[in-house]
Amino acid sequence: MTDPVLEVRGLTKRFGALVVSDDIELTLRPGEIHAIIGPNGAGKSTLIAQICGGLRPDAGRVYLGGQDVTDLATRDRARMGLARTFQISSLAMEDTVLQNAVLGALGASRSPWGFFRPVLGRTDLRARAEACLDRVGLLDKAAMRTAELSHGERRQLEVAVALTLSPKAFVMDEPMAGLGAEGGAAMTTLLDGLRQEAPILLVEHDMDAVFALADRISVLVYGRIIASGPPDAIRTDQAVRDAYLGDGA
């Protein structure tokens, strides 16, 4: 079995007496989509924040490519190849599509931001940004203001910005949120193709997308993983059905 690209060992977080992450163990392997599902308030956002560096765990470690990144800031994890997309858009709406992608590429580099010279003049950053826009199908809209994109296209742009990091692993927080049937199908196809470039840790409420994409599913309830395994096993697990999926799954 191949070594995991991303690994979580014994991650624990408490807010007073409330345990929001209870000794969580997770792995993400090359070529894999590992979905995390669970009801609202289960602790998914808190878990993702700890994995990506926005929140420090009380116990446990996070490893990326075999290196312990637990004590690193979010930007340093990103530069090491941990690429995150957010449930709520973090794009610069008044900038162009290309500018958003170039700024993503600049953030991934260790070069100075260069406020006194146009970053679009950096041919290396522009080339990387354009390649990532092309990968998600937005290169023809590079000059458009981001605010003019559809909701689905903004989701695609968020993936393109994440791609500029040349990621080792993606952490995606509800990429299907707000998408209709057509947009959801397009995003499903995009994510399915991305897994060979970098595996995806996917937090998602859209169960059709989860069961279509995931190689493994972990179910988080009240800060604890109650089940983890292939989709068919999760679908028929009675504890999972009782806690989250219901009998109609």
Label every PLM stretch briefly.
Residues 2-249:
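Glycine-rich phosphate-binding loops of nucleotide-dependent enzymes
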